[in-house]
Amino acid sequence: MKAVILAGGLGTRLSEETIVKPKPMVEIGGKPILWHIMKMYSVHGIKDFIICCGYKGYVIKEYFANYFLHMSDVTFHMAENRMEVHHKRVEPWNVTLVDTGDSSMTGGRLKRVAEYVKDDEAFLFTYGDGVADLDIKATIDFHKAHGKKATLTATFPPGRFGALDIQAGQVRSFQEKPKGDGAMINGGFFVLNPSVIDLIDNDATTWEQEPLMTLAQQGELMAFEHPGFWQPMDTLRDKVYLEGLWEKGKAPWKTWE
C-alpha cells in the first residue's frame, strides 16, 4: 500500500525555520519531521511514498537525491576528486516526489497525485507535520473490514500546558500536557479508496471541508479511534516539545529500532 504525504505548505507559524525550507523539512533530533513520519509508516511495512511537494520543494528533492550523504559519514578525497561513504545507510523506500503547486490547498494537492494511486484498492494519506504512536496496520485492517470509502484517525488533542496534581493545597505531581477537553478530533491519518478523489474539484479545494463533509453525509466516513500519543508540529513551541522528547529518549512515535 502507498502513503501520500502532504509536504507543500508554507508553515507560517514556524517562520523562523520555514523561511528557508518547507515545514516537513524542519528537523526533530537532526532529521526532518517528514523522515520521522515515513519511519512511522515503514515500521508497519509501508515502503512506497508519494510526497506532495510545493513551497521550496527543491529542498525535499535535494534531501532524497543525497539521502546517503545526509545519513552517513563521508570522506572527500579532494586531490583525487573522489568521495568515500562510510557505513552507508539506506531505506527500503520508493519515494515519488510530485510538484503539486505552490498555492494548492490540501485537496488540490491530493487530486494532483491521483494518477499514482488510481489503480490501488486503497492508500494512506497524511500531513507532513505530525507524529503519533499510531498502529498503522490496525487502521488498514479497520478500513478493509468496514468497507466504506474513507477512514480517519480520531484522537484527543494534547493540552497546551502541563497540569498540577494538587491535594489539600499541596502539589503532589506534575503532568506533561494532559489531553484536551475530552472531545476527539481529526488526527490527520487517513486510509482512503481512490474514488474519494472524485469529490475534489480543483486546486482550491480544502480536503478537510467539502470532501470530508460529503463523505460523512454519505455515510462513507469511518473513525479509527486512537487514544495514544499524537502531536502536530504547528508552532515553535510544538517543535521544542517534540525535540525534548526525542533528546530524552522518550519519543512515543519512535517504534522502530
Swiss-Prot record:
PANTHER family: GLUCOSE-1-PHOSPHATE CYTIDYLYLTRANSFERASE, GLUCOSE-1-PHOSPHATE CYTIDYLYLTRANSFERASE-RELATED. Homohexamer. It catalyses: alpha-D-glucose 1-phosphate + CTP + H(+) = CDP-D-glucose + diphosphate. Its EC number is 2.7.7.33. Its cofactor is Mg(2+). Pathway: Nucleotide-sugar biosynthesis; CDP-3,6-dideoxy-D-mannose biosynthesis; CDP-3,6-dideoxy-D-mannose from CTP and alpha-D-glucose 1-phosphate: step 1/5; Bacterial outer membrane biogenesis; LPS O-antigen biosynthesis. Mg(2+) binds at residues 129, 234. SUPFAM superfamilies: Nucleotide-diphospho-sugar transferases (SSF53448). One of its GO terms (biological process) is O antigen biosynthetic process. It comes from Salmonella typhi. This is Glucose-1-phosphate cytidylyltransferase. Belongs to the glucose-1-phosphate cytidylyltransferase family.
